[in-house]
Structure formats: structure tokens, C-alpha cells
């Protein structure tokens, strides 16, 4: 049984506090984009969970979030069968685009159908939260306000069909390290989430592009100054606005039209030769 597992971007990411367990309390606007991995799962004749992937650098053991999802799902519903999981990876790894989380989400959704468990989305999201804070959102997808550590999800009016260019530099970033180095007291300006939500409801891409904000840029851009150059190059190439997604290092930019986006794509691909560059669009969860 196959399923597309879509990437996400953060149109806004704000940190407003910390829990006792040191997890940051966040307010984020998340958005699904049309860049996806393909997850294919079949039952096996034994009790083993095996993973194969087309990219050699993706772990295929218990470090893989898809593997963790399969283990938790089996435990939760007392399933004895093993599964063979195949991952066709297109989403860049350690990129701030929820590549691992969206794979875990797809594994839970597929296994729910494959074994006729018929668990509700809410139950799947509860299992997903044990794997990672982005997994519940990845199960739901679309345009959403995510609060808490990311698990409190409020669907928003779809902000679909917006053109963007995405650039993932040829290095990864540790999400844990970024959050460890984030000092909430040094955040001088918090994100105007409500203003952004209003603009998105009005389909005002220009306002969204110029006012989107990610407080994690304070940490990641300090360590990787090339990201500032990438953002600047995107703007000079005609972007309405550019920002880092999640903990980085991926940077994305919205464009008014496909021709300008195409030119920016070609320029960025030429300048940042060892980076992954994509043209994609925002999509609604109903497209999943």
C-alpha cells in the first residue's frame, strides 16, 4: 500500500516559553508543500520490521522515524505481523521540512488501513506525538496553527497554490542543538501570528511574504551565515520574501509568478551548485 508523504514549511515560528521538561512552547503556522517522499508498505511473512530506502545516508534501523512508527503502532494494537517499508526519498534530510516526521505519519496512516484497525486520526496523532512533535501535524497536513510543542493543531483556511522556490544547502542542522541554543529572553520581537493568519485568510501573499518570521533564524543564521546570502539572493531574484523553515537550514521564498520563480531557480541552482533546489507549490490537506 503506497502513500505520498508531503514536506512542510513554517510560515511562522515563534517560541513563547518552556515546559518543565525543557521542551519549548511554540506558536507556528505550518503549511504542506508539493514535495513528497513515497512510502510503500506490505505485510511480511514474519514478525520483522524492515526498511529500505533509495538514499544510502538515510538510516534503516530503529533511528528511522518510520521504523519507530511501525513499532509503536504494532505495540498499540497488538499486531504480530511484520512489515516491509520502502521509502523513496525526495525530501531533503535534516532540512527543517519534517522529512522524517512525515514518513512516520505516513507509516501510521498506511498501517491503520493495511491492518484494518480503523483508529481515528486523533488516536494516530497521539501515537505520532510519541515519535516527534511534528508528526501529529504531518498526519493532518494543510494550513494550520500549531501550538504547545506542535501537537495542538487548529486548521486554517487553505493557503494553497502559492509558488515557492526552496533551497536546502549541502549541510544539515540538528533541531535539538538549535533549540538548546535558543534564548527566549533574547527574542526582541515576537511573531505577529494573528496578523499573518488574517493576511492568509485574505489571500494576501505580499503581506505574508514580507511579515513571515522564524525566531530560530537567530540561532541558525548566526552559525551558518551563508543562509543570509541565500535569502538575499532570493529577494534579488524577485522573491516577495524569503525565510528559513523550521530549525533550518532550508530557505524558501514566495514568488508572484512562475516565470520569475523559474529564473530564480536557475540562478540559485547555478550559484549554489551542491545544494538541492526545488520549485514547488503550497497544497491543501485535501490533496493528500
From Swiss-Prot:
What keywords are annotated for this sequence in UniProt? ATP-binding, Isoprene biosynthesis, Kinase, Nucleotide-binding, Transferase
Record's catalysed reaction(s): 4-CDP-2-C-methyl-D-erythritol + ATP = 4-CDP-2-C-methyl-D-erythritol 2-phosphate + ADP + H(+)
Classification lineage? Bacteria, Bacillati, Bacillota, Clostridia, Eubacteriales
Q: What class of enzyme is it?
A: transferase
Naturally occurring in which organism (per UniProt): Clostridium perfringens (strain SM101 / Type A)
Pathway info: Isoprenoid biosynthesis; isopentenyl diphosphate biosynthesis via DXP pathway; isopentenyl diphosphate from 1-deoxy-D-xylulose 5-phosphate: step 3/6
* Record family assignment: Belongs to the GHMP kinase family. IspE subfamily.
Q: Does the keyword Cell membrane apply?
A: no
Binding-site positions, ATP: 92-102
Q: Which GO terms describe its molecular function?
A: 4-(cytidine 5'-diphospho)-2-C-methyl-D-erythritol kinase activity; ATP binding
What is the E.C. number?
A: 2.7.1.148
Tell me the Pfam families matching this sequence.
GHMP_kinases_C, GHMP_kinases_N
Query: What InterPro entries has UniProt attached to this entry?
Result: GHMP_kinase_C_dom (IPR013750), GHMP_kinase_C_sf (IPR036554), GHMP_kinase_N_dom (IPR006204), IspE (IPR004424), Ribosomal_Su5_D2-typ_SF (IPR020568), Ribsml_uS5_D2-typ_fold_subgr (IPR014721)
Q: What is this protein called?
A: 4-diphosphocytidyl-2-C-methyl-D-erythritol kinase
Q: Which gene encodes it?
A: ispE
Which Gene3D superfamilies does the annotation name?
3.30.230.10, GHMP kinase, C-terminal domain
Q: Which SUPFAM superfamilies match?
A: GHMP Kinase, C-terminal domain (SSF55060), Ribosomal protein S5 domain 2-like (SSF54211)
Q: Which GO terms describe its biological process?
A: isopentenyl diphosphate biosynthetic process, methylerythritol 4-phosphate pathway; terpenoid biosynthetic process
Catalytic residues in the record:
8, 134
